[in-house]
Structures are given as C-alpha cells and as structure tokens.
C-alpha cells in the first residue's frame, strides 16, 4: 500500500511539473526521493541547488529515520507516503515511556509528549547528523530571505513555498495569479463557507480564515434571531393589536348613530384591521359587509402583483406596489413567517394620504381610539421599540405622531371627526413634520406627498443613496438603476468610487450626486441602530486599521476589491434580513485516536484587527438591544456568547500576526477546526424548536445554502423606458488561495469567500425568493458577478484538489 502511495505521489509531482511548463512562474518541484532516505543520506551532499521545501525535508530526514512523529503536518504527511516511516513512528511510540516525567501545570499534552521524548533521549542525533541538520538550517535561513524576491510585476517568490505538494495538481494559471497578487479566488459552488474549512481540516490544508466567514455567521445570527422573535413573540403581538383595534373601530361604527361621517370612517378602519387580522391569521374577523370589503385587498395581497385599489384613495388611478407583499428573505421558511410578513407589510405600507381629508380623518379616528386601547398600544410599543433599535426610525408619518397631534385638540372625538378646521390643523402639522422627516420618496410623485402608516417602514441611509444616484432629469434616463457600489462610495470607500468613475457613465450629474451623498453620509449617526452599526462595520473592514503592519497581499488594489466583494455581499445579506422593515426606494410610485500527538497544521487569520474589534462591538450592541427589549432567550444568549468567543479569538490571532508574535500550537489547533466550530453554531441557529440536527446535511430548504437575494430598488421612473427591479444577492461560496508568511516560511493556505452578485429583472416579473434564486444558480452559476471582480478570479476547468495521498486527518 505504501509503495502504491509513493508511486501516486511521484505521479502527482510529475503532473505538477507538467502543468508548469508553459508558465513563467512555478512552484518548486522536488528533487529528492524521500523513499530512499531511510538507508542513504549523503551528509556531504551539495545543497546549494535545492529549493526551500526540499531543504526542509532533508533537514528532518535524520529524525524521520528514528520514527519521530513530526509536529509539522506537512513534513509528517510527506514522510507518511513512504513504506517505512509510519512503522517507525509506532516503534517510537512504544519506546515513549514517560512514567518518570511529570507533566507541568497547564502543559498541553502535545508539548509534554515532545519534551518528555527529548528528556528520555528518544531524539538524540550523532555529531554527523547534527552537523548535517545545522548546515541545512543555515541554508534554509538564507533561502527565506528571498521570500519576496520575485520577478518584475510579481509580489511573492513561489519557489519558496514550503508546502508545494499540498495540492494534487498545481495549475499554472493559479500559480501565476498567486505570484502576481499573493492570492487568487477560484469560482466554486460550495453550499456554505464552513464546508471549505472542514475539507481543509480533513486534508490538513492550512486554513486562511476570512472576514467573510464571520460576516456570514453574523448574518445568520441576525436572520435567525429575527425569525425566533417574530414567530414566537411579534406575530402574536400583532394579531392581538389588529384584533383589539378592529374591535375598537367596530364599536365606533356601532356607536356612530346618525353620524354618517363617523360611521363610514369607522367602517373603513374596521376593514383595514380586518385585512390585517386576516393576513396575520388566515381568518376574517369582521362582519359580512366588512369581510366583503376586505376580500379584494386580501386577494391582491396574496396575488402580489401591482394593481389599482378602491380601498386607498391615492391608488384609484395609480398602481399600488402589491408585488412587495410577496414573502421574501427568511419569511418563506414557514407559514407563520409568511403570514407575519404579509400582515406587517400591510400595517407598514398601506398609507393614509394627507392630501385626502377622508384619509386624514381615518388616521385621526385610529389615533383617538388607540389612546384608550392600553393593551393594544403596549403591544404596538413593544414591537415598535425593537424594530426602531434594530432597523431604524420610521420614514413615513407614524400612528404615534398622529396621536401627538390629536392630544393637542380639546374636542371630543365625535366633534373632532367632523371639524374640518381642526382636521386641517392636524393635517398641516403632520405635513410639516413629514416634509422634514420623510427622505425616501419617488422622484415622480403621483400620490400624497406625505403619508401616514400605522407602523411605517424604516429609513436606512443606503436607500437614500440608491434613490439619489439615478438620473431623473434626462429623457430617456442616462442612469436608470443605481449600484451597490454607490452606497459604499458615498460612505467614503475610495476603491468603490474609483471603480464607479472608471466605468462608462453618460450621466453628467453623477459626480454632483455622489458628492451630495458623501456629505449626507457624514450626517448619519452610525451607532443609532443595529443595521447602521452593521453598515459601519463593513466600512471599517475597508479602512484597514494598522495598514503599515498588514501582510503584503492586503495592501494592494486587488485586495481592496476582495474587501469590496465581502462588504457588498454582507450588505446584500443585511438587505435580505431587513427586507420587511426597511423602506425600499423607487423611481416612481470523526476518526480514531492515536498514541502520538496529532501534527500541527499552521493556519492564518485575515489580520484586519479594526474589523474584528468592530465586529465584537456590533455583536455586543445587538445583544444589548435584545436584552433591553426582553427578547433575548437563553438559547440566543448562549449562541451570542459562542460567536463572541470566536470573534475575540480571531482578533487575538490577528493582533499576534500583525505584531509578529508567536502563535501557540493550541491556537493553531483552534484555527484548524474553525469550520466545524462555525458549522455547529450555524446548526444551533437554524434548528427549529425541539429539533435536533446531526449535521448540515439534515438542514432542509433554502437555509442549506449561503446563496440569497434581496430586491433593493424599483427602477420605475417616468423617464425610464426599461423599468426594472434591482437585486443584490450572494451566490455560492468561492475558494480563496493565499500565500502567507508564517514564522518566516511561505505557506499556501485556502479559505472561503462570499460571492457578491448584482442584477436586474423586468418590473412585471415577481420579486425573487431565495429558493428561486438558488434554482437560477443551478442553471447559471455565475449570474450577476460584477465585471470589476472578474480579474481576481482564476477560472479553472476543475477545482484544485487537496493531495489526499499525502495529507488527511484521522480526526473528526
């Protein structure tokens, strides 16, 4: 078996060499045959022509002859391909009698094993062997000085890789990209980022832990905490609120007597809450007459196609956006969430337009009644506070603002409803507030300038940028759809602005609009909500705190684009999670144990300490909001702590890497198993109540894949002949290969990155769900990849394969 493995290994090396023939750069091809090193080592050999990886192997040959179980996973893996090494390791283990060697306090078993082995003389060398080892160590130290002595236009010396056979076949195109940029992204179709790290663990492939991995986990955390809170608490709050407010309106209808104005107003409002209750529960609550009036609205909501409305005065002759009622995001995951989505969308988006006195009157009646509905308003306030802290302030006028204005009136409700002068005062006061407050407005308004909503959707600064960065002046428009890059350029991310300005743009107003938005973004309180803190965390990722200490590959324009890909993908996840609450802009209306220690696989964490600090702060603030609103369950609290510990660990490693401090073997072990760690946390997040998931293969539905989609802008301006919907999305996970320097040696590492996507589809088509997006990716895996990212990709005919003949783990 060992002979067969050795022959396979030789073939792999020959294939690697063949793949390099046409390349100006290549990885080192071994000139030594480790199989022959058991009996014959030429201690006087000339080593001046050997590559660094061979020098390291030869330096360890005397120890291999003694069966020493190397701590270095790569060296142990290479010698493990011989017919003789493993049997010698077992003999070494049999001699390892440490009964008289006491373990020190807090000493890891691996450290104890190697210390004890040395103390009982298991790894002593002859003078000739030691001289050979010392000579090779000196040569190794000399070669390391050339780690970054590469040819013109290259950043790293690929000949100095110390783990060149980590891949079964090292594609020349991948090698060229690595030499040029220090990293390369290989398009892949992994369901989850942590799958790549788990495969690395199995293959003893050094991990490169990306910020993407944490960003994906944070998205899942927010997404799942919202689901839990919405299904277990908020849905019932809104069912009760709608029911109580319906009964209040029904009472006023019954009490109206001969006051026809009051009766019609109360009837309309009763229908409003009848619809809400039906959407939340699937059942009508009203009278036969009320249900008959509610049914057409419910049908339009369920059909989710833009249409006219007899119920809303603004939309008799203008189509209302019923398409927005289609459950998307995580709201497709259960029937309860679908009902919650539709019901909340009704309360958030059905307007009482201030240019229609009848609708002002309706809003005033709801406000008057709400003052006496203590439990209903407690439910309202509980949800409103939480959503405000998580998502932002209302953009349209809210029920609370109408209540404030009603309180200023000394009239009884019956008199107020019929007092045109007082209603006009309230209308004008609300208009004054709305003119200052509402920032997300269509450029081509055809309905009331100010709208009152019971629970308005929330202002988020990215929406203001998107609506501003389109051409509403020229006919036809010269920029009909904004880009995700617009938002980050407005936030001051230089690389985003550079990409935008390098693109062909016929709209002369672009620069002025961008400068306007850059100024506006300086006025935002980024600490105000969880969503704005998330956005600011993404900005910090691009800032690169301590840039002068960062590794060579992170201070390049190419890595800036890698960062942009990560922040845009995470932003797409944010929009996915906030799709119900954020107001959308529009143009117009395991293995066995062992007697010897497991080897150490050295890994690397993307050392962006500024990001890791901000990520911990973001997590802490999210937990604080949940605690403040009594929404933090014991399960969420435990998961939050686990995620925090991972972020704190990644920050600590980043700080060590930047400071050049030694990373312990135990820390490398933790990096090695980070894929399994993140999978376990993710499983805890997505599992249902009382559900047990053995592994990710047990996860069902859209949650199984990282791919998701969110519609963020409706391009339906009057001057736009090609009306469409803009989608921000994440595709399946890609692989990233990075050449990093650890303890003076260049290692090939592998990690996972998010895949940002952006695309449009015609306005008349249904807004996409995650399930439909994932189906589209099965037919067109690279749909929506932006042009500016394509130079970073290495489009290989097949994914690089880890060299399992050399490297595999016996652990879980």
Where are the predicted features?
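C-terminal motif of bacterial Sec signal peptides marking the signal peptidase cleavage site
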Residues: 14-17
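Surface-exposed, polar/charged faces of alpha-helical domains
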Residues: 49-53, 120-127, 131, 142, ...
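Acidic/histidine-rich, surface-exposed loop or edge segments in extracytoplasmic proteins
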Residues: 33-44, 62, 112-120, 626-633, ...
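Bacterial signal peptide processing site
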Residues: 19-21
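Compact alpha-helical subdomains of small soluble proteins
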Residues: 70, 78-148
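Short N-proximal segments of mature Sec-exported proteins
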Residues: 39-43, 48-76, 80
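Long, non-catalytic protein-protein interaction scaffolds
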Residues: 148-812
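Positively charged n-region of N-terminal signal peptides that target proteins for export
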Residues: 1-5
């Amino acid at each position: 078996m060992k002979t067969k493995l050795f022959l396979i290994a030789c073939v792999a090396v020959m294939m690697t060499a063949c793949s390099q023939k046409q390349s100006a750069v290549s990885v080192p091809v071994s000139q030594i045959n480790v199989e022959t090193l058991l009996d014959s080592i030429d201690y006087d050999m000339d080593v001046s022509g050997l590559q660094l990886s061979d020098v390291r192997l030869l330096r360890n040959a005397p120890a291999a002859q003694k069966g020493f179980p190397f701590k270095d996973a790569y060296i142990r893996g290479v010698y493990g391909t011989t017919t003789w090494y493993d049997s010698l390791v077992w003999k070494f283990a049999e001699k390892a009698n440490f009964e008289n060697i006491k373990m020190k306090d807090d000493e890891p078993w691996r450290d104890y094993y190697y210390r004890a082995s040395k103390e009982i003389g298991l790894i002593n060398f002859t003078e000739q062997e030691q001289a050979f080892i010392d000579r090779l160590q000196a040569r190794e130290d000399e070669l390391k000085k050339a780690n970054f002595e590469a040819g013109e236009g290259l950043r790293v010396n690929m000949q100095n890789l110390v783990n060149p056979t980590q891949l079964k076949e090292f594609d020349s195109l991948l090698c060229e990209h690595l030499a040029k940029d220090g990293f390369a992204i290989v398009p892949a179709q992994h369901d989850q980022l942590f799958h790549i790290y788990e495969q690395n663990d199995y293959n003893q492939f050094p991990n490169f832990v990306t910020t993407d991995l944490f960003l994906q986990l944070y998205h899942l955390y927010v997404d799942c905490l919202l689901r839990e809170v919405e299904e277990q608490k908020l849905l019932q709050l809104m069912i009760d609120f709608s029911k109580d407010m319906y009964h209040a309106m029904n009472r006023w209808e019954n009490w109206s007597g001969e006051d026809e104005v009051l009766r019609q107003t109360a009837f309309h409002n009763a229908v409003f809450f009848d619809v809400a209750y039906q959407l939340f529960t699937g059942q009508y609550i009203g009278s036969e007459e009320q249900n008959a009036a509610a049914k057409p609205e419910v049908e339009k909501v369920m059909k989710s196609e833009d249409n006219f409305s007899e119920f809303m005065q603004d939309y008799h002759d203008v189509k209302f956006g019923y398409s927005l009622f289609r459950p998307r995001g995580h709201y497709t995951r259960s029937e309860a969430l679908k009902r919650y989505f539709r019901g909340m969308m009704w309360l958030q988006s059905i307007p009482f337009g201030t240019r229609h006195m009848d609708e002002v009157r309706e809003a005033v009646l709801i406000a008057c009644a709400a003052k006496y509905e203590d439990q209903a308003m407690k439910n309202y306030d509980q949800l409103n506070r939480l959503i405000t802290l998580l998502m932002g302030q209302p953009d349209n006028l809210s029920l609370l603002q109408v209540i404030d204005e009603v309180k200023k009136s000394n009239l009884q409700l019956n008199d107020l409803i019929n007092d045109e002068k007082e209603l006009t005062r309230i209308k004008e006061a609300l208009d004054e507030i709305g003119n200052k407050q509402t920032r997300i407005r269509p450029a081509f308004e055809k309905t009331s300038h100010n709208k009152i909503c019971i629970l308005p959707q929330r202002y988020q600064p990215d929406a203001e940028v998107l609506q501003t960065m389109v051409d509403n002046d020229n006919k036809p428009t010269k920029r009909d759809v904004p880009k995700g890059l617009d938002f980050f350029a407005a936030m001051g991310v230089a690389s985003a602005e550079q990409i935008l300005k390098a693109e062909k743009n016929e709209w002369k107003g672009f620069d002025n609009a961008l400068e306007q938005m850059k100024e506006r973004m300086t006025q935002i309180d980024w600490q105000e909500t969880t969503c704005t803190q998330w956005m600011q965390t993404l900005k910090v990722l691009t800032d690169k705190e301590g840039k002068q200490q960062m590794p060579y590959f992170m201070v390049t324009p190419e890595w800036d684009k890698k960062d942009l890909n990560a922040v845009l993908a995470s932003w797409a996840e944010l929009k996915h999670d906030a799709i119900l609450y954020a107001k959308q802009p529009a143009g117009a209306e395991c293995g066995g144990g062992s007697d010897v220690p497991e080897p150490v696989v050295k890994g690397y964490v993307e050392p962006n300490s500024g990001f890791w600090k901000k990520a911990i702060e973001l997590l802490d603030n999210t937990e604080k909001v949940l605690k403040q609103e009594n929404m933090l369950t014991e399960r969420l609290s435990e998961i939050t702590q686990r995620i925090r510990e991972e972020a704190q660990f990644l920050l600590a490693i980043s700080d060590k890497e930047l400071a050049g401090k030694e990373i312990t073997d135990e820390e490398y072990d933790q990096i090695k198993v980070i894929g399994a760690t993140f999978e376990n946390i993710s499983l805890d997040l997505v599992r249902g109540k009382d559900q047990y998931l053995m592994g990710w293969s047990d996860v069902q539905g859209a949650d199984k894949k990282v791919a998701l989609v969110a519609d963020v802008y409706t391009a339906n301006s009057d001057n736009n002949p090609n009306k469409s919907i803009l989608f921000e999305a994440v595709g399946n996970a890609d692989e990233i290969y990075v050449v990093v320097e650890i303890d003076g040696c260049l290692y090939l590492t592998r990690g996972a990155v998010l895949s940002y996507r952006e695309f449009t589809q015609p306005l008349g088509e249904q807004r996409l769900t995650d399930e439909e997006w994932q189906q589209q990716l099965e037919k067109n895996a690279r749909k929506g990849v932006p042009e500016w990212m394509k130079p970073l990709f290495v489009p290989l005919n097949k994914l690089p394969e880890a060299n399992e003949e050399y490297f595999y783990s016996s652990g879980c």
